[in-house]
Amino acid sequence: MKLTLKRKFIAVLALTSLLGACSLFKNERRFEPAKLADIKQSIVVNTVWQTSIGSGGSAGFAPVYADNSIFAATPDGTVVRVNAENGNIAWSTKLDTKLTSGVGVGDGLVIVTDRKAKAYALNAQTGEKVWDTELSTISTMPPIAGFGKVIVRADDFRVQAFDSKDGKLHWSFVRTNPILSLKTNSRMALINNAVIVAVPTGKLVSLNLNDGTVNWEIHSASAKGPSDIDSVTDVVGQPLVFNDGVCTSSYQGNITCYSIKNSRLTPVWFEPFSSAVGLGYDNNIIYGASIDGTVAAFSLANGQIAWSDQTLINRGLTNPVVYQNYLYVGDLDGLIHVYDTKSGSLVGRFSVGSSKDIVSPLLPTDKGVVVQNGSGTLMLIRAN
């Protein structure tokens, strides 16, 4: 099946303020969310547990699964550790500040950032504050921690590395910023004493954790079009990192997979696919949700499209995730749509109990899929 893409409604991204006054998009029915038809549901999605943790979320408020627990935060300053088996809250800490991102977990710490351009490190076992430190500016990307370092990418695209023990700054990395860039749910990844992070104009870099030097750099998406808006492109979501390769998705760009050998990256394949969220992966298949609502499956080996579906056009989709042969994706009405991973058929639909859009990334675990809904409820769901 040939995958066809449409021009995207950029208002779903941070470019809203630039385009809001333009008459170009007025009365455009083609950007209206698709109405949902009834489907034959062959599976039942159940709530294993749910618990209220705070005041909603946003694209940067991604929960994390570690040590049989779910760590999460909400904008009102609440940070929690929840038992992944039953949803019981192990601890809840209320910081006297407004948070701008979800959690980073590693080295026995839980890291969050706030509107005052500070990072806070909490003890992962008790929730007590260990240290805090100043950032270059606010950060809406979740931090990441490991190998003795806490990494924060601020909204000026500066990457800073702090010591996990005391928050002391070790190094800083920055590139010249473009005129326009996206504010979306990009995330970092750690592998082999390096952090992989998106920087402006569609680039992805691997930085040595010891000193911040560049191990490698790839241009995952190239600017297109005559105007500043047409030329906006950035890597989105969390890159998929394998022992010998990395795959990325980008806005106004592609899904691209590279092989890594001796710190050199070679493109293996790419497929045009504009997305504002990250990729899903399972059993040698990559899953993407495009900016226009297309959901598609690609072969990891060569990028061949296994299936694609356009039932959810313009429904503001989350990142797709897989749990036990089913693909889950959330939308702007607080619904989870479930696909059969082999056929691409919609087999189930589930409301997360809030009509607000699901903006926090879905989180796959070995127990089910974790959802942080727009009303501040954390839940674990799975299909039976």
Swiss-Prot record:
A Pfam family per the record: PQQ_2
N-palmitoyl cysteine-type lipidated residues: 22
Cellular component, GO, one term: cell outer membrane
PROSITE patterns from the UniProt entry: PROKAR_LIPOPROTEIN
Keywords tagged on the record: Cell outer membrane, Lipoprotein, Membrane, Palmitate, Signal
Top-level taxon of the source organism: Bacteria
Membrane disposition: Lipid-anchor
Subcellular location: Cell outer membrane
Any one GO BP annotation for this protein: protein insertion into membrane
Signal peptide: 1-21
Lipidation (S-diacylglycerol cysteine): 22
InterPro entries documented for this protein: BamB, PQQ_b-propeller_rpt, PQQ_rpt_dom, Quinoprotein_ADH-like_sf, WD40/YVTN_repeat-like_dom_sf
Record's subunit section: Part of the Bam complex.
Free-text function comment from the UniProt entry: Part of the outer membrane protein assembly complex, which is involved in assembly and insertion of beta-barrel proteins into the outer membrane.
NCBIfam families: assembly_YfgL
Family that this chain belongs to: Belongs to the BamB family.
Name this polypeptide is given: Outer membrane protein assembly factor BamB
Organism of derivation: Taylorella asinigenitalis (strain MCE3)
Lineage: Bacteria, Pseudomonadati, Pseudomonadota, Betaproteobacteria, Burkholderiales
Gene name of this polypeptide: bamB
